[in-house]
Regions:
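Catalytic core of non-heme Fe(II) oxygenases with the double-stranded beta-helix
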Residues: 80-177
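Non-heme Fe(II)/2-oxoglutarate
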Residues: 7-106
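N- or domain-start disorder-to-order transition segments that initiate the globular core
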Residues: 1-6
Length: 177
């Protein structure tokens, strides 16, 4: 997994961040994407969030809902590895001690650890023509007394074209630009 230097990370505006094309090995990303399509055939082109297939996807979506107990939630995260081994490999790689050490070196933040609950994390998808509003993710964990220090977004869109839109944008604090 590619990283940038600490100097480059902290020189980004309006907030320290990194954007790395081909961050992960492309063959791993392609295999993960293909697994998601095999498990959820309408992954690439679905338009109806209420379809039966779409509802079934929630079975593997590792986001803790308020009506789910911890065992079900953790089981679902673990199920991802058995159903989609390459996706599971990415999850494992990005939560590994080695990766956390690299993030720590790049950011200068010591004692990083991952959220074993994946609260607010996991696999997210925007439908064709969909939109995700500009927002700020929570800072305080919804269950534990932890502060979020780093977000990581990994896009799995092979052959993505800039004219499609959907670019990652960093806005200023008052969301005016």
């Amino acid at each position: 997994y590619e990283m940038v230097s600490r100097e480059e990370y902290y020189s980004q505006q309006p907030f320290p961040h990194m954007v790395v094309d081909n961050f992960a090995p492309i063959d791993l990303i392609n295999r993960a994407y293909k697994e998601l399509i095999e498990v959820w055939p309408d992954w690439a082109y679905a338009t109806d969030p209420n379809s039966e297939r779409e509802q079934n996807k929630k079975e593997f979506y590792p986001y803790r809902n308020s009506n789910e107990d911890e065992k079900i939630y953790i089981k679902r995260v673990n199920d991802m590895e058995s159903v989609c081994p390459h996706v599971g490999q990415i999850f494992n790689d990005l939560t590994s001690k080695d990766f956390l050490e690299k993030l720590g070196e790049m950011t200068g933040i010591t004692n990083l650890f991952t959220d074993p609950y994946f609260a607010g994390g996991g696999i997210h998808r925007i439908y064709t023509g969909g939109h995700l509003n500009v927002h700020t993710d929570y800072m305080l964990h919804p269950v534990e007394p932890w502060y979020r220090r780093i977000n990581l977004l990994l896009y799995l869109t092979p052959d993505w074209q800039e004219e499609w839109g959907g670019n990652f944008e960093m806005w200023n604090e008052d969301t005016t630009e």
